[in-house]
Amino acid sequence: MKIGVPKEIKPQENRIGLTPESVKTLVSEGHEVIVENNGGFEAGFENEQYTNAGAKIANSAADIFNDAEIIVKVKEPQKVEVDMIRENQIVYTYLHLAAAKELTEGLIKSKSINIAYETVTDDNGRLPLLAPMSAVAGRMSVQAGAHCLEKNQKGRGLLLGGAPGVDGGTVVILGGGVVGENAAVIATGMQAKVHIVDKSEARLKQLIKKREKCYEDRRT
């Protein structure tokens, strides 16, 4: 099949749908992969890395949407992309349609086939493609929060991890899922006092066991 990888155009989105290593795997399976010119540049991948992996380079997103049977993206299609999606074209990406009425209507009108990464579920009811995004979000939340506590950001001037003779901050995390767990990892690493609130007692016990194992591993 012809698989197209356009450059992401959503503001502040610098990732790309496929890495050169993923392209190499798909090409070895007999697929044709087309990557937009400099599509992976902001993610640290050069055109040459994609061509070495077996991909072809397209001059524009329009060429990709016009030629590919499958479109592989990271974030939801923007208006200009929706207008290029063809009937029966398959689109893989994070869609988050619940709060995007216009996008939902546009995709329905295009009669395309859309697979949202965030709703892909494994046999155990977990969301394996959403978990990595949630992990990043959790870790970034503490990093961003610590930055906002600085005085020059109109914060309280609090150093989250404290300093010799100065108490650190207290972090309260609502929810002990993937986001919450990863937020706790970073906050704990910064030596803040961390409290997690979750409605599931079983999940809280699981997190406590993970913490205890982490301490044991450090001692050994």
Segments predicted by a language model, with ranges:
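Glycine/serine-rich phosphate-binding loop and adjoining beta1-alpha1 elements at the start
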Residues: 2, 8, 79-169
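Glycine-rich phosphate/diphosphate-binding loop of Rossmann-like nucleotide-binding domains
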Residues: 6-7, 11-42, 154-220
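Short low-complexity, flexible loop/linker segments enriched in glycine and/or proline
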Residues: 48-52, 74, 129-133, 209-213, ...
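An N-terminal-biased, well-structured beta-alpha scaffold segment characteristic
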Residues: 2-106, 110
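Short, basic, helix/turn surface patches
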Residues: 58-70, 138-151, 220
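Residue-level detector of alpha-helix initiation sites
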Residues: 76, 136, 177-179
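Generic secondary-structure signature for well-ordered alpha-helical cores
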Residues: 28-32, 55-56, 70-73, 109-113, ...
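Short beta->alpha connector loops at strand-helix junctions that form conserved
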Residues: 36-37, 60-61, 94-96, 116-121, ...
